[in-house]
């Protein structure tokens, strides 16, 4: 093991605890390959300890007055703001995205904490004083207990902040299993929450892989599971946790289509599509992975997209003006290369080859912006979620055809349209099968006070993340009818 490189600890019952598993994995900087830390691959027994700590803490936390919980969250928000730059740098170091994008991700995480701090309002029930003569009814919200969260590598700040602040604000306790690829940020979030005054055991972190995940899904004292990640894993999480009687929300894969109409402002469309397709190296569930070019604008649109992609600076995200950082691991880079080779083999036209960018030869896991033209819906690069800076362009003649193409996908997370025509927007809104829609913008991810998630194979469950859906997910109701 490299001298001077820390081995991370689990956070259980308010204490930093060394894993007893004896197993670790390296956490490299994707831009350089340098090992930043080692993450423990913890055992199921260690997960059980965290659940016990959370269950014990729930006894008192659930009875903590809601305004007191809110004050702790307000303090937490203040600390996150004070450490904003530190957190953004840490996101860039372990994830690889540009510092500007990491800074924005920290902002989105802080906004989630701000929403959760509104717990006194969010937890309010409803009452009707006269359902019959002398009889009244009321609905009251209560926490559900110990909640488990399983988060991905691509948003190590934002996605955990979707989960544990709101769950905790609602009176629950939480066990977080962050991605073993980006574990350092999760530990820092826990440190700051403790500094804000969060009681021991309310938030716990257990690093690991399959044993920890399965432990969360099957543990009888875990009442709900929130998951963000790939579609196959999300489906497994949903089925396994549901079979063990848990409430589940699983946000999974995506293949987001951007429809560009002939009347669109192409400069706006190109700017937004470039940001949406290649920001975060394409490793996000709201990435624009398919452009559907409608009618005669296709040639000009392709030309402008390639020209804009050629201007992007590729490199270490900590360097000034870098737009496109590396993908998360060498294996993911090689997987992306295989998709590019497959796209060529299946007959798509490769108009920009990200394998040829100079940065690809560096030590990091770089792949440049890649664009395919004349892609069809029978091609693998259209069907699969590549999760990399690869953009496919499909050509059609009408909006009806464009919507048909988008709706063929088994994924339905997001979709966008670029147009000046309100009639086009209305038709798109009514007929597209997707959960989050954008008009003349590339990433229609809603703010924390609206629900976030898609349809079809992009989501398993009933209640989405964030907004009042999140409050509903993390609470249960009691109805009381009284005669006086």
From Swiss-Prot:
Positions in coiled-coil regions: none
InterPro entries, per database record: Ald_DH/histidinol_DH, Ald_DH_C, Ald_DH_CS_CYS, Ald_DH_N, Aldehyde_DH_dom, MeMal-semiAld_DH, MSDH_GmP_bac
So what does this thing catalyse?
3-oxopropanoate + NAD(+) + CoA + H2O = hydrogencarbonate + acetyl-CoA + NADH + H(+); 2-methyl-3-oxopropanoate + NAD(+) + CoA + H2O = propanoyl-CoA + hydrogencarbonate + NADH + H(+)
What CDD domains would the database entry show? ALDH_F6_MMSDH
Q: What is its EC number?
A: 1.2.1.27
What GO terms are given for molecular function? malonate-semialdehyde dehydrogenase (acetylating) activity; methylmalonate-semialdehyde dehydrogenase (acylating, NAD) activity
Q: What is annotated as the active site?
A: 285
Q: List the disulfide bonds.
A: none
List the SUPFAM superfamilies hit by this protein, alphabetically.
ALDH-like (SSF53720)
Residues the record lists as binding NAD(+): 153, 177, 180-181, 230, 252, 385
Kindly list the biological process annotations in GO that this record carries: inositol catabolic process; thymine catabolic process; valine catabolic process
User: What superkingdom heads the lineage?
Assistant: Bacteria
Q: In which pathway does it act?
A: Polyol metabolism; myo-inositol degradation into acetyl-CoA; acetyl-CoA from myo-inositol: step 7/7
Class of the enzyme per the UniProt entry, highest EC level: oxidoreductase
Q: Any idea which UniProt keywords this protein has?
A: NAD, Oxidoreductase
Protein family membership: Belongs to the aldehyde dehydrogenase family. IolA subfamily.
Function (record text):
Catalyzes the oxidation of malonate semialdehyde (MSA) and methylmalonate semialdehyde (MMSA) into acetyl-CoA and propanoyl-CoA, respectively. Is involved in a myo-inositol catabolic pathway. Bicarbonate, and not CO2, is the end-product of the enzymatic reaction.
Q: How does it assemble?
A: Homotetramer.
Q: What is this protein called?
A: Malonate-semialdehyde dehydrogenase 2
* Species assigned in the record: Geobacillus kaustophilus (strain HTA426)
What's the encoding gene here? iolA2
């Amino acid at each position: 093991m490299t001298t001077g490189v820390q081995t991370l600890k689990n956070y259980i019952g308010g204490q930093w605890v060394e894993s007893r598993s004896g197993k670790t994995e390296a956490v490299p900087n994707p831009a350089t390959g340098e090992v930043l830390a080692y993450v423990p691959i913890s055992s199921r027994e260690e997960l059980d300890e965290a659940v016990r700590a959370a269950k014990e803490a729930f006894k008192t936390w659930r009875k903590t007055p809601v305004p007191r919980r809110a004050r702790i969250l307000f303090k937490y928000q203040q600390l996150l703001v004070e450490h904003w730059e530190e957190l953004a740098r840490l996101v860039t170091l372990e994830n690889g995205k540009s510092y500007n994008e990491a800074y924005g991700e920290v902002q989105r995480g802080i906004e989630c904490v701000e929403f959760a701090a509104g717990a006194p309002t969010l937890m309010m029930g409803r009452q009707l004083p006269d359902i019959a003569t002398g009889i009244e009814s009321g609905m009251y919200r209560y926490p559900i207990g110990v909640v488990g969260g399983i988060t991905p590598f691509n948003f190590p700040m934002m996605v955990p902040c979707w989960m544990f602040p709101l769950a905790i604000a609602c009176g629950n306790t939480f066990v977080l299993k962050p991605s073993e690829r980006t574990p350092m940020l999760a530990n820092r979030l826990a440190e700051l929450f403790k500094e804000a005054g969060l009681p021991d055991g309310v938030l716990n972190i257990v690093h690991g892989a399959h044993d920890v995940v399965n432990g969360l899904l099957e543990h009888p004292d875990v009442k709900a599971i929130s998951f963000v990640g790939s579609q196959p894993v999300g489906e497994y999480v949903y089925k396994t946790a549901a079979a063990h009687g848990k409430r589940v929300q699983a946000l999974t894969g995506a293949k987001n289509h951007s429809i560009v109409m002939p009347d669109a402002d192409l400069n706006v469309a190109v700017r937004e599509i470039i940001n949406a397709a290649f920001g975060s190296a394409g490793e996000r569930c709201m990435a624009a992975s398919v452009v559907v070019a409608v009618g005669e604008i296709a040639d000009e649109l392709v030309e402008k997209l390639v020209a804009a992609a050629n201007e992007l600076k590729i490199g270490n995200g900590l360097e000034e003006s870098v737009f496109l950082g590396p993908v998360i691991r060498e294996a993911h880079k090689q997987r992306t290369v295989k998709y590019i080779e497959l796209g060529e083999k299946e007959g798509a036209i490769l108009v920009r080859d990200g394998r040829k960018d100079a940065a690809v030869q560096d030590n990091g896991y770089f792949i440049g912006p890649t664009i395919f033209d004349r892609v069809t819906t029978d091609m693998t690069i259209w069907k699969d979620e590549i999760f990399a800076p690869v953009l496919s362009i499909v050509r059609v003649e009408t909006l009806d055809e464009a919507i048909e193409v988008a709706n063929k996908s088994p994924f339905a997370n997001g979709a966008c349209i670029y147009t000046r025509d309100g009639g086009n927007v209305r038709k798109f809104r009514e007929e597209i099968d997707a959960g989050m829609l954008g008009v003349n913008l590339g990433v229609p991810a809603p703010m924390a006070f609206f629900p976030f998630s898609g349809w079809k194979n992009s989501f398993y469950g009933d209640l989405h993340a964030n907004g009042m859906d999140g409050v509903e997910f993390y609470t249960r109701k009691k109805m009381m009818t009284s005669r006086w």
